Each structure stands twice: as structure tokens, then as C-alpha cells.
Amino acid sequence: MALPEFSMRQLLEAGVHFGHQSHRWNPKMAEYIFGARNNIHIIDLAQTVPLLHNALKAVSDTVAKGGRVLFVGTKRQAQDVVADAAKRSAQYFVNSRWLGGTLTNWKTISASIKRLRHLDEMLNSGDAGSYTKKERLTLQRERDKLDRSLGGIKDMGGLPDLLFVIDTNKEDIAIQEAQRLGIPVAAIVDTNCDPKGISYLVPGNDDAGRAITLYCDLVARAVIDGLSRAQGDSGYDAGAMAQPLREELPVVAEARFQGLAGPRGVADDLKKLTGVSGAIEKKFNDLGIFHFWQLAELDHDTAHKISEEVGLPSRADAWVAQAKTLTEAE
């Protein structure tokens, strides 16, 4: 096993280089910005490549020494990816709302985890039938609520040794708690974020779905590398196992935008985007686009293809930037 390899081409294809609108930047990120195009900051991937390698090495080294990695990503486009990467690498995750004190008040969190385990036992035991329908429903709701917040860390058994974070602005409480306890943080830091206090900073787009998938896949594979090294250092012969460890390689399919069959709840007013009329909004809807967050997740090439289909190809980058702003304002 070895650290996962990646290329600058992969980063470009995933849209890692796209930052936020230039007027929404954090000046502390100036040294990591290559320039601006259409009022969108472009991240210097020549710096991202070695910094990402350093972060992956830190992850692998932490796990090789027996440490635990906690994946943190609670924004909508990161939730499923973060959970999948953590599960695939036998680590831990928080992908719902971060509960204040998750790290700094671990004793209380442990009590809640104990309650979650107890509810699991109650609902899965043969005695579950002794409860009334209303009692079972109440217990199930309590169990589901706890599982959303704590399900990814219920088997952690103690504080993590390293945090991997998507979006340092959104996860600022988690980062502050880690800093108070001296837990190192590896994080994807966009152009609107403050890099202060991040142990292993990786300048990159923290909004695009493809970029988030790439980061999480690389970190998961770095964890697997660390686990393999730990087994080798202990003299354990993984090759002698009846069922040897396997690294699950992700199936990389050609990126293809998939619209929604209909809006999720109330559709957003897409006419708030510059140059979007009622007719163009209808074209967006025909393509399955009803919400700003859908546009905010688009990579560069897909955004241009969609803007061509609605008749305004020159607006692609501006629409994505505006959609990000409007999504964050929700």
C-alpha cells in the first residue's frame, strides 16, 4: 500500500480551483489565490497539490500509529459523501448538525451515545412488542434524532486524533473545539475562509460535489494506507488472512448532471439570477433545476453545457457564483 496518488488534471476536472466571488474573499487566503476570472477567484493548484499530499500523509501517519480520524461535513452536498468515505475506511463521521461540546464535553456526549445504544437494544429486542404503538413511535423518534447526530461516532470510543473538515466556515465550532483540545485539523479551505489554526490546510473549492467526492475518496484511501502500515508494523501478515483486506476503489463514472423530477419543497425564484427571465427559468425547470443549490454544485463544464441549453452560455460562471451566495444566505 502507498499514499493515494492524484494529479493536477483530476483537481481541475473536479473544479477544485474555483473559489468564491472576488468581493467575498478572506484576505488571509491571498497567498493561495492565483488570480480572478469573471469576478471568481481562482485557487493556485500549484500550492494545493503539495498541501493536499501533506494532509494525506498526516492522515495516514495518524492511523498508522493507532489514531482515529473524524470526518466532518454537515453541508447538504457533503453529507452522504462524508458518511460513505468514513464507513469505507472504518473511521467516524459527523454529517448532521454539530452538537456543541461534541469534543469538549465528551462525557455528556458519551451519555447520549449510551442512551442511543439502549434505544437500539429496546427497539430491536423481542420485548419491543410489549410497548404500545405510541410508545414505540416516541422511542423511535428519540432514537432517530440521536442517530442523526451521533450515529457516526457511537463506536468511536473516545476523542479523535485528527479531524478532516469540509468547509471551515460552516464547521467553525468543531474546529474551535479541536483547537482547544490540541487535536490537529486537516481541512479544505476555500477563498472565503480563515486559514488560521488549521494544521493541514488544503486550498480548494468546498462547494462542488465532484471536488468534495475527490477529497473524501483520497482521505479514505490514505486511512486505508495507514491501517495497512499499522498491520505491517505489528508483524501481522495480511496476506495470510482467509479474506485479505481490500481497498474499495470508487467507480468513477463520467460526470453527468441529473435534474430533479420536481422541486424539493418550494422552488427557488431563479429569476433572482442575473439575466434569467421567466422563459429561461422555465428552461431551467425543464432541465430539472428548481433550486439555487443545484446550480451551486455544478462544475465548470457542466455549468457551461446547461447555460448553453438555456441560451446564455456566457452567464455560466456568474450564475454558479450567484447561486452559491444565495444558497449560503438561505
UniProtKB/Swiss-Prot annotation:
GO BP annotation list: translation
InterPro entries linked to this entry: Ribosomal_uS2 (IPR001865), Ribosomal_uS2_bac/mit/plastid (IPR005706), Ribosomal_uS2_CS (IPR018130), Ribosomal_uS2_flav_dom_sf (IPR023591)
Keywords, in A-Z order: Ribonucleoprotein, Ribosomal protein
Domain of life: Bacteria
Cellular component terms (Gene Ontology): cytosolic small ribosomal subunit
Pfam families: Ribosomal_S2
CDD domains: RPS2
Keyword Ribonucleoprotein attached: yes
Gene Ontology MF: a single term: structural constituent of ribosome
UniProt KW Iron keyword: no
Transmembrane segments: none
Family assignment from sequence similarity: Belongs to the universal ribosomal protein uS2 family.
NCBIfam families per the UniProt record, alphabetical: PRK12311.1, rpsB_bact
Name of the protein this chain belongs to: Small ribosomal subunit protein uS2
Species in which this protein is naturally found: Rhodopseudomonas palustris (strain BisA53)
Taxonomic lineage of the native organism: Bacteria, Pseudomonadati, Pseudomonadota, Alphaproteobacteria, Hyphomicrobiales
